[in-house]
Amino acid sequence: MARIAGVDLPREKRIEVSLQYIYGIGKTSAKLILERANVSPVTRTKDLTDDEVRRIRETIEQNVKVEGDLRREISLNVKRLMDLGCYRGLRHRKGLPVRGQRTHTNARTRKGPKKGLVRKAAAPAPKA
């Protein structure tokens, strides 16, 4: 099993698909990586030679930010927006949609489950 960027790639899938198991690599970047590393995209992961795995690993390390580094950069970017106090930062802080979507209806994913109506407790019956 090939291990690239701390991720075990599935053996039976084509390398083009296997690379997409790494956070930060999608279809397009997987194709570009394989093109730069001179590896056929239809090769199965189990059929890769050690040299091909090394070339893929080096290409990813040099050209693409993946896994922990990418996650860290994204969280720092969001934190920076919140520290600035700009509109996008405030929306992140409040847990609301950031990109201009409506919130009167919808946006349940960002806002969380509905807060139910809290009704007053029924008043006890007056004593006779």
UniProtKB/Swiss-Prot annotation:
Pfam families: Ribosomal_S13. This is Small ribosomal subunit protein uS13. Keywords: Ribonucleoprotein, Ribosomal protein, RNA-binding, rRNA-binding, tRNA-binding. Part of the 30S ribosomal subunit. Forms a loose heterodimer with protein S19. Forms two bridges to the 50S subunit in the 70S ribosome. Located at the top of the head of the 30S subunit, it contacts several helices of the 16S rRNA. In the 70S ribosome it contacts the 23S rRNA (bridge B1a) and protein L5 of the 50S subunit (bridge B1b), connecting the 2 subunits; these bridges are implicated in subunit movement. Contacts the tRNAs in the A and P-sites. Residues 95-128 are annotated as: Disordered. HAMAP family: Ribosomal_uS13. NCBIfam families: uS13_bact. It comes from Anaeromyxobacter dehalogenans (strain 2CP-C). The lineage of its organism: Bacteria, Pseudomonadati, Myxococcota, Myxococcia, Myxococcales. PROSITE patterns: RIBOSOMAL_S13_1 (PS00646), RIBOSOMAL_S13_2 (PS50159). Signal peptide: none annotated. Belongs to the universal ribosomal protein uS13 family.
